[in-house]
């Protein structure tokens, strides 16, 4: 599994790309089985990037048994991942002026097997020249970081409240 189990949540960040250079916005993904053609396409493109990395050893090929185990682990935290993703989108929407593309699900390898709430944030589209310029700006990246930070604090507080009520 690409994730260590001792963490309380997993937030991965990435930059998106699209053949349609007019597409803009940010979105947050959580792990699921690919159910739509779009989800399959997005996951295929994202997962293909692993082949370009120097340390491919971090990404083991998943046997059927490992896929089942990873799916079970991810499923246990699906609702919490949905809550975390929604809070992230809400907080980023307060900070950014680009479109909020919402919370989505796809079978990203980097999210599989997480025994914790786990999401992937796509902070913008490098394929769009305007967003590429924004993403190169330290002040814009700080807005993204601030939004994510506030979302983590808000999510943590919501989890502590739930645990206190149990």
Predicted regions and their residues:
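Proline/glycine-rich low-complexity loops and linkers
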Residues: 50-69
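Active-site-adjacent mobile loop/cap segments within catalytic or ligand-binding domains
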Residues: 16, 69-166
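Single conserved hydrophobic/aromatic residue that forms the stacking wall/gate
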Residues: 1-11
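Hydrophobic/aromatic beta-strand patches that form the interior of the parallel beta-sheet core
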Residues: 11, 29, 119-121
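Short, solvent-exposed loop/turn segments at the edges of secondary structure
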Residues: 4, 23-24, 37, 114-116
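Short Gly/Ser/Thr- and Asp/Glu-enriched loop/turn motifs at secondary-structure junctions
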Residues: 6, 23, 104-106
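A short, glycine/acidic-enriched catalytic loop
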Residues: 17-52
